């Protein structure tokens, strides 16, 4: 790793149809083996399904879901004097969004269903309503941070 300085932070690009950075972040996380066109197909089908289910703006549902799943605080393993402590740390907005997207995709992959677009749309609608596996993961992370609050001074 270079010690010359900090790396420039890359700004995420927008997707071609919705001109939305969150959609592009989702596409890049859902993509496997460089198949970006397939990832775009999955996302756009999921967005159409959200439109059909909720009859509201699907991008606002997406934003609401990601905002609901984004954690404020997480735990990080830190070795102190021979024992490892789970130290609670605050999370920035970009890292929080990345975690939220990862959790949403993981939860939708675990769901039973026909295809990924259907599973992703269901998970996003559930997350926007405040339920689902991704929300449970966020609450679990917050509980862990609260339980290990005593180790916060090890930061």
Curated annotation (Swiss-Prot):
Q: Which organism is it from?
A: Ananas comosus (Pineapple)
Name any one GO molecular function.
Answer: rRNA binding
SUPFAM superfamilies xref list: Ribosomal protein S7 (SSF47973)
Keyword terms, alphabetized? Chloroplast, Plastid, Ribonucleoprotein, Ribosomal protein, RNA-binding, rRNA-binding
- Pfam families named in the record: Ribosomal_S7
One GO term under biological process is:
translation
**Where is it predominantly found?**
plastid
Superkingdom in the source lineage = Eukaryota
The protein depicted here goes by the name Small ribosomal subunit protein uS7c
Entry's Gene Ontology cellular component terms: chloroplast; small ribosomal subunit
Q: How does it assemble?
A: Part of the 30S ribosomal subunit.
What family does this belong to?
Belongs to the universal ribosomal protein uS7 family.
State the function annotated in the UniProt record.
One of the primary rRNA binding proteins, it binds directly to 16S rRNA where it nucleates assembly of the head domain of the 30S subunit.
Record's keyword annotation contains Metal-binding: no
Subcellular compartments: Plastid, Chloroplast
* Keyword check for RNA-binding: yes
Which InterPro entries would you find in this protein's record?
A: Ribosomal_uS7, Ribosomal_uS7_bac/org-type, Ribosomal_uS7_CS, Ribosomal_uS7_dom, Ribosomal_uS7_dom_sf
